[in-house]
Amino acid sequence: MTKLITTVKEMQHIVKAAKRSGTTIGFIPTMGALHDGHLTMVRESVSTNDITIVSVFVNPLQFGPNEDFDAYPRQIDKDLELVSEVGADIVFHPAVEDMYPGELGIDVKVGPLADVLEGAKRPGHFDGVVTVVNKLFNIVMPDYAYFGKKDAQQLAIVEQMVKDFNHAVEIIGIDIVREADGLAKSSRNVYLTEQERQEAVHLSKSLLLAQALYQDGERQSKVIIDRVTEYLESHISGRIEEVAVYSYPQLVEQHEITGRIFISLAVKFSKARLIDNIIIGAE
């Protein structure tokens, strides 16, 4: 049965004891409202590590002034049940006051990796992500940490953070988990109307179009972006906020495509903003 830990002090006590005995720790940081994408990461950790820890913490630092922290879905009882079913050992669910007992004296700034894509639209968001992930890594001290490729910019930033701050953890990127029709699984999908849900499948279909163009030899980003945009405009009612091609993991905008690339989409429906991506090409 999965154990619920609610304080930093108790979590640190458990981790220190585990480390002394040579136990390997797998860690999945989340903000809760778990779905199959999260559970895939939990299963991967359970199959590899002696102990699997899942954090459920809605981090206020990564919410902007126009983003409703209080409205973010919280369902700790259901989350605990879900991860228990797939074998997680511990859910770490601290209070905000325990994670941030006072005003932070040191600000962590991400830099250029956060100046594009989602980071450009949400100033300070990735500073908040890096701050909380740093804290969680120091508390949990994982050997392996699992992040979804659906948030590919976040994954690239966390990998750079681990390198820059010498964290003794290996980051494992987990492929996007999709519904049977191709829609990327997301906590936000519940906010889609029935019509929007039918339209949302075209995000992944447009990425398959981009992949086909690339495989046919197209190397001009503008051609791919224009074709994807045209496809989306003819299939969805939501507002297309982004169709972009960047190098990966460097996140430099590409015009003439070389090497590994990241094609990113963002579409705003009435009550949900959906993102999706595909990473293609040689490293």
Swiss-Prot record:
UniProt source species: Staphylococcus aureus (strain Newman)
Binding-site residues, (R)-pantoate: Q62, Q154
CDD domains: PanC
Identification of the protein by name: Pantothenate synthetase
Keywords in alphabetical order: ATP-binding, Cytoplasm, Ligase, Nucleotide-binding, Pantothenate biosynthesis
Subcellular location(s) per record: Cytoplasm
Active site residues according to the UniProt entry: H38 (proton donor)
Miscellaneous field: The reaction proceeds by a bi uni uni bi ping pong mechanism.
Enzyme class: ligase
Residues reported in the UniProt entry to bind ATP: 31-38, 148-151, 177, 185-188
UniProt xrefs under InterPro entries: Pantoate_ligase, Pantoate_ligase_C, Rossmann-like_a/b/a_fold
Subunit description: Homodimer.
Pathway named in the protein's UniProt entry: Cofactor biosynthesis; (R)-pantothenate biosynthesis; (R)-pantothenate from (R)-pantoate and beta-alanine: step 1/1
GO cellular component: cytosol
